[in-house]
Structure formats: C-alpha cells, structure tokens
Amino acid sequence: DYVVAGFISLEEDTSKFIVNYFLFDIRQGRNLLNGTARSSADSLVLSSHKMSNRIYKQITGAEGIFTTKLMYILNPEKDKYQLNICDINGDNEITLFDSPEPIMSPDWSPDGKKISYVSFENGNSEIFIQDLSSGKRNSLRRYPGINSAPVWSPNGNYLAFVSSRSGNPDVYLYDLKTEKISRITAHYGIDTEPSFSANGRKLLFTSNRSGTPQLYEVSLITRKISRITFDGNYNARGRYFPDGKNIVFVLSLIH
C-alpha cells in the first residue's frame, strides 16, 4: 500500500550526508511525506532511525520505536550475569551492571533516566534503582524473603513491587520522594506481577487467591480489588494497553 524511497548524496565541502526521502500512498496516488536529513557519517544510522519514526507515525498515527533502547539480561557463562542496553537494531551495546548472581525484572523509568531491577548479589532477592547517567545504585531496603517484580508508575514517582516481608507475597507501593512503603494487597494467596494503568490510579496483578493464577485489578484510591479474568486455569503477566481500555496477558486453556 505504500512505497518508501530515498536518495543520499555527500556534501564534499562539509563531508555531511544529505538524505532525501518520501512516502508514497499507492491507493490514494499521492505523496504523504517528504523529508530531508543532514548527517555526519557517525550519526547516519541514528538519522535513519529518526526518519523511520516519521514514516511510521505518518502511516499508523503512533509514535515510532526506532530511536528507543532495548534492555535485557545475558548469562554468557556460568556465574556471570549482565544487565545490558543497546539500540533497537542491536548496536551500541553497554553493560549497566554485572554480577556472579542472577539479575531479574529490569524496568525503565518513564523518562528513561533510571532503571529498576532485582539482584541476588547479597544472597537474597533485592530491588535496586540505578541512575543511568551516574551509574549510582540504591537499594529499596533489604528484607528477607521475596522482593521482586518492580515496575514504575507513569509519572515516575512510585514503584510497585512484590515482597514477602509480612510472610506472604503481596503487592507494595514505594514512594520515591518520601521513601514510604505502603502495602496494597493482603491475602494468604500469592499476589505478584503488578502493572500500572496509564493514569497511574490502578494496578493489575496476578494472584492465585481463587485457586489458580488469575488477573485482578486494585484501585490505588479505594483499595477495592476486582477479579478480571475467569476463563482458563492460568491467566498471568497482565499489562494495560496505553488507551486503558484493554489488557494483554498470557492465557492457558489447557486443563
């Protein structure tokens, strides 16, 4: 339905590359986008990613992901774990943290300046927040038992996470400004995998309080909890769509 074409030339006096590109709608028979980018050789890939973002948004209406970063965990050899980031195409790989003990559950802050993750470096699961510019790491306090699944609120002011500090895995909320921790769920079942709604007023989480893993929603205003899924014996890892109207999750219908 669309054709993307581009032409590249070199400015001899500046050694800059000039890229002219356009997006053509075949069905409508018209140009949708014309663009020009001027770039050095070192930043040519970044410029192409920015062009891809413009083209993607023109076609879909959504923001492109081509200038974003990937964050992932590697276990290249025994007793070696790495938390890395790289460009969307795999280039410019950087190791943010490495440890002889497992690393789990990395998550970006909304502004992309910090990350959270779980590390077992001190013999127990412990949640850390790391500043990407300075590399400074702070622990979310050390408690025995389970400390896992940290996720950032949309405004970057809170972390939801799971802890068994009271004897059973429940969902907690950490205020990054006051450093106050609030307990959100209190049940003898296992509550885990919290996820914020787009407006930050609700949390989706997985619980086996009904006997099998199912998705539940809790209001952070009223603390009212509602069961979301009923079909199947395994529904987990729920995440809200950005529009707040739908969720995506893992479902198993095998009995």
Role assignments for model-derived ranges:
Residues 1-52:
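Amphipathic beta-strand/beta-sheet edge segments enriched in Tyr/Trp
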Residues 14-18, 78-84, 124-128, 168-172, ...:
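Structural motif
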